[in-house]
Amino acid sequence: ISILAALFDEVVEVLLIDEPEVSLHPQLQSYLLREMKSAAKRYNKTIIISTHSAEMIELNSASELCNFVFFRKDSLPKQISPDTPELNSVKLKEFLLRMSLIYSEGFFAKKVMLIEGSSDMILCRYLCNRLNLKLDVAGSQIIPVEGKGQFPVITKLFRLIGKEVCVLTDLDGFTDDNNIKFIINNNTVIIINPITIKIEY
C-alpha cells in the first residue's frame, strides 16, 4: 500500500524501491509493475527498482532493454546502449513481444543453457539429479526454446545482456538450419546424437 501511495503522490518525483515483489504473489507483482509504469508516464516520475523477480521483467520493445542494469559480483554493471545495432533486429523485436516468463528467469542467471524442448529438459533434469549437479546454485538457467530456429535470436538477446550462453541441440540443428552455425564461434555447443554425447568448444 505504501508503494502505491508513493506512486500516485504527485509531490514524489523519484522513487527507489528495493525488491517490490516481497510478499506478493505473481499476479500482484504483475499488477504492481503495471501501476509503476503507469505512474511513471502519467506523473513523469523516475522509478528505479532492484528486483530478483522474473515477474518484474516486461518488454514491449527492444529499446526497453536499455532500461535494465545487470549486476554481477565479479564484473562491472552491464547496461545496453540505445545505439546498439542489435536493437534494430526485426527478429529480436518480434521475439520480445512474445517472450514468456521462462526467458525472463534467464535475466537473473550468470549462464544460460538453451535447449530444444521438453525431451531435452527431461535429459537435463536426469543428468543433474544423477550427477548431483546444482546448476541453480551455480547461477545457471536451463531454457527450452520454441524450436531450434529460435536459437540465434535468443542467443543474441542473452549475449546483449552479458550472459554466457550454452546450446544443447541435435545434429539436425546444423543440417536443417544454417543460421544456427554462427553460435559455435563464441559459445559452447553441446551436440546430441543417438549414440554419444559430444561436447564441442
Task: Locate the predicted segments by residue.
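Noncatalytic linker/hinge segments flanking ATPase motor cores
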Residues: 13-15, 45, 55-62, 88-94, ...
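Short, low-complexity, polar/charged sequence segments that are solvent-exposed and flexible
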Residues: 34-35, 67-69, 88-89, 133-134, ...
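Conserved helicase/translocase motor-coupling segment
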Residues: 109-184
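A short acidic, often aromatic-flanked loop/helix-cap motif at beta-alpha or helix-coil junctions
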Residues: 75-78, 149-151, 199
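Non-catalytic alpha-helical coupling and interface elements of nucleotide-dependent molecular machines
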Residues: 41, 73, 129-133, 188
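Switch/communication elements of ASCE P-loop NTPase nucleotide-binding domains
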Residues: 1-105, 121-122
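Activity-critical C-terminal alpha-helical subdomain
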Residues: 174-201
